[in-house]
Amino acid sequence: MKLDLNKAKKRVDYLDKLRIQRALSDTPESFQQVFKLIPLLLHFNHPDLPGYVPGAPTSIANFHPNKFQQEYLSNILATENIKNFLKKHRTFKSEAILGVYVMGSIASIAQTPQSDLDIWLCHQENLSLSARELLQQKTECIQQWAKRFNVEINFYLMDQKRFRCFRYAAPINSENCGSAQYMLLLDEFYRSVIRLAGKPL
């Protein structure tokens, strides 16, 4: 049974990779860059990187920058050795973000070059209110950065407990106006979700 479960997890990971490839095909290069950098900008909080907010919680569980993300860091942090930077930030005291997921029309036949990105960010249950507010500010900064490339991002912050109990998770853009709409969002989430980084669902 355990072996079958491991195989199933690998198949889901493979399917996510295929769906990401499909999502990025026939999209502008600027969209692709923003899409690929979202996990990186959430994982690190550096003054030279977009989305920097002093004191904001950082680190995504099990996240390791890929080649594209490392090259981006090398270009941005030109005066800093990238290997030393990654080594210094390899171990965080705690991983504030458990997972980052994209949902909605992405990678579906409904996707268009104008499609926005609905990003669900699952954070630690014990994150303080002040830390959550700083994390929200960080996502808002990333939203503003993405708009420079004509990419719209909607972030939804939630913790494990609220998600499991189907309780309200407030989106930053305030489009979610009640628990009924949230349940519809939750249904859409499970039907269309792709894991970008962090722990599997």
Locate the predicted segments by residue.
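Catalytic core of pol beta-like nucleotidyltransferases
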Residues: 1-101, 107-113, 124-201
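Active-site pocket-lining segments that scaffold enzyme catalytic pockets across diverse folds
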Residues: 116
